[in-house]
């Protein structure tokens, strides 16, 4: 079964972070980006700018109030939570074994990583060979690339 990868940017206030995540996701060939719990500048300017980009490219941007809404509405087979300090599995150039169906990959939009309650029930992952937090856009670039190129076509 092919893998459909959908990135989720959660708990974000930065305009630039939303726009950069949209550019990254769409440039990797992904059709959908989900933004949850956007507030401040991200909600006022980042989401509209990302929506403009999505419409221009024929892609989708889904904006929801909470992470659980994305999980409930998109019904993923797997949820991967990017948690540098509590990773159970590492994602490297070979992708991640055992993934199939729809996979949500949740990146924290702020400096603190995902709260343990937000990552509950998810597979906690980080990047093979990277020590410490490098920021959500760098994490997304590496993890999404590895998932998409490591095994099967994960374009969603």
Curated annotation (Swiss-Prot):
GO terms for biological process: DNA restriction-modification system. It is an enzyme of class 3 (hydrolase). Keywords: DNA-binding, Endonuclease, Hydrolase, Nuclease, Restriction system. A putative type II restriction enzyme, its methylase would be APE_2002. It catalyses: Endonucleolytic cleavage of DNA to give specific double-stranded fragments with terminal 5'-phosphates. InterPro entries: DUF2122_RecB-nuclease-rel. The keyword Chloroplast does not apply. Its EC number is 3.1.21.4. This is Putative type II restriction enzyme ApeKORF2002P. It comes from Aeropyrum pernix (strain ATCC 700893 / DSM 11879 / JCM 9820 / NBRC 100138 / K1). To M.jannaschii MJ1199. The keyword Nuclease applies. GO terms for molecular function: DNA binding; endonuclease activity.
